[in-house]
Amino acid sequence: MTTESRLTFYHSPNTRSTAALILLEELGAPFELKVLDMKAGEQRQPAYLVINPMGKVPALVHDGALITEQPAVFIYLADLFPDAGLAPPIGDPLRGPYLRWMVFYGSCFEPAVIDRSMQREPAAMSTSPYGDYDMMLSPLTEQLAKGPY
């Protein structure tokens, strides 16, 4: 990242944006932190909806470009700070599996864990993005068993 680049990070405590905030801090990234009070509804105010029309966090703005969705922010930051060694570079054969597991988090793992923790039945197998909890956990467990990581 060049010294002229500018990162602005929109965060609310006790939300999924906390992981992205920790990543920014661990990377030593220069960024401006904007904290939203979601209990007061700041994420639904016109000033923030101009930034992120969905009114969600995390939101990262880099030189005017908006990045939302936690896995996208993680991937973007890993690519923006390649010296940290968090992601295989484009062209590396490991890039595909890396992207698979980064996207798996938001599209399969998190929805399955939330449904399980809230004691909700998953959607029908034909419409569920992850099948059911055990179906989601099986490939993850198999991958982690290969270790080390």
Model region roles, listed by residue range:
Residues M1-P71, L94, A124-P129:
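N-terminal G-site of the GST-like fold
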Residues L21, I75, S138:
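Active-site phosphate/pyrophosphate- and oxyanion-stabilizing loops and adjacent acidic/basic residues
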Residues Y48, L86-P88, Y149:
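Short clusters of hydrophobic/aromatic residues that line enzyme substrate/ligand-binding pockets
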Residues I51, Y76, A112:
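Residues that scaffold the ATP/ADP-binding catalytic core of kinase and kinase-like folds
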Residues P71-P82:
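A basic- and aromatic-enriched beta-loop-alpha substructure that forms the phosphate/nucleotide-
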Residues A72, P97-R100, M135, P139:
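Alpha-helical elements of Rossmann-like donor-binding domains used by nucleotide-donor carbohydrate transfer enzymes
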Residues D83-R120:
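The first long alpha-helix at the start of the GST-like C-terminal all-alpha domain
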Residues Y105-Y149:
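GST-like fold's C-terminal all-alpha helical module
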